[in-house]
Amino acid sequence: MNMLITMTVNSALSFCLISIAFWLPHLNIYTEKASPYECGFDPMSSARLPFSLKFFLVGITFLLFDLEIALLLPLPWAMHSPNTTTTMMVSFMFVSILALGLAYEWLNKGLEWTE
């Protein structure tokens, strides 16, 4: 019963907060707040810099592989478990999947800087 009350209160509170957050920002929209600020002067040019999508994709790929490699760091401590063959097989499969992902990115030229 306590779990049901907790879930109901949490759901109601979440719904209320999401509703408030959805409707509240639409009250005060000023064009001056949305424009870029250059020490009180009118902007000379657009403040939006061009962003390289290739850089973004390489960065995301790096973060994914870095996170997956970080999952391999506790592997030496896992070797102290009584069933080392299962640990070795799981780690070998994990590294194989990483290698396949890297090969896929490489063959599709996802790691190339220039085209």
Curated annotation (Swiss-Prot):
**Pfam families, per this entry?**
Oxidored_q4
Lipid bilayer topology = Multi-pass membrane protein
> According to its UniProt record, which reaction does this protein catalyse?
a ubiquinone + NADH + 5 H(+)(in) = a ubiquinol + NAD(+) + 4 H(+)(out)
Key word Mitochondrion present? yes
Q: What is its main location?
A: mitochondrion
**What are the entry keywords?**
Electron transport, Membrane, Mitochondrion, Mitochondrion inner membrane, NAD, Respiratory chain, Translocase, Transmembrane, Transmembrane helix, Transport, Ubiquinone
What Enzyme Commission number(s) apply to this enzyme?
Answer: 7.1.1.2
Annotated Gene Ontology cellular component terms: mitochondrial inner membrane; NADH dehydrogenase complex
Q: What class of enzyme is it?
A: translocase
Localization terms from the record: Mitochondrion inner membrane
- Report quaternary structure and partners: Core subunit of respiratory chain NADH dehydrogenase (Complex I) which is composed of 45 different subunits. Interacts with TMEM186. Interacts with TMEM242.
Protein's recorded name = NADH-ubiquinone oxidoreductase chain 3
Q: In which organism is this protein found?
A: Notiomys edwardsii (Edwards's long-clawed mouse)
